[in-house]
Regions:
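Short beta-strand/loop motif that positions the catalytic acidic residue
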Residues: 115, 121-123
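C-terminal catalytic histidine-bearing segment of alpha/beta-hydrolase fold enzymes
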Residues: 139
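Serine-hydrolase catalytic machinery in alpha/beta-hydrolase-like enzymes
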Residues: 1-65
Length: 139
């Protein structure tokens, strides 16, 4: 949905707590967050998912390489951002140190074997769709 006010506030709070915080706007190629989540969601569906994934992996490497970084990378994501957290945990086994996806589907099953980082997965107890997805992860 883009870099909405809530995500900006989460990044602000993490930075205030002393972390290097980075909150990219996946909608940047389309002009950025449009001001409401529904329009942002519609815009997101027009983007190239592979390019977005590659951009987030590049951002993760960039953050880990910063002089003031301790080399550890944690990620928090909501909805599509939750998927990105799952993807970062699975695309390269040592990229992510820990992740907290709030909803967000798991990455491709072929990548599950790469997951080494602990994930604190946030889901609604009665949400059957996501429970099916988690069974694939053996969670």
């Amino acid at each position: 949905r883009g870099l909405n006010p809530y995500v900006k506030d989460v990044a602000r709070r993490l930075a205030k707590a002393g972390f290097i915080a980075f909150a990219p706007d996946a909608l940047h190629p389309l002009g950025g967050y449009p001001g409401n989540d529904d329009e942002g969601r519609a815009m997101q569906h027009t983007l190239d998912r592979t390019k977005i994934q590659n951009d987030f992996v590049a951002a993760a490497h960039f953050l880990k390489a910063q002089p003031n970084s301790n080399g550890k990378l944690g990620a928090v994501g909501f909805c599509f951002g939750g998927y990105i957290v799952n993807y970062l945990a699975s695309v390269e086994s040592n990229l992510l140190t820990a992740g907290v996806p709030f909803y967000g589907t798991p990455a491709s099953e072929s990548l599950h074997k790469n997951i080494k980082a602990p994930l604190m997965i946030q889901l609604g107890e009665l949400d059957k769709e996501y429970k099916r997805e988690l069974k694939k992860l053996k969670v």
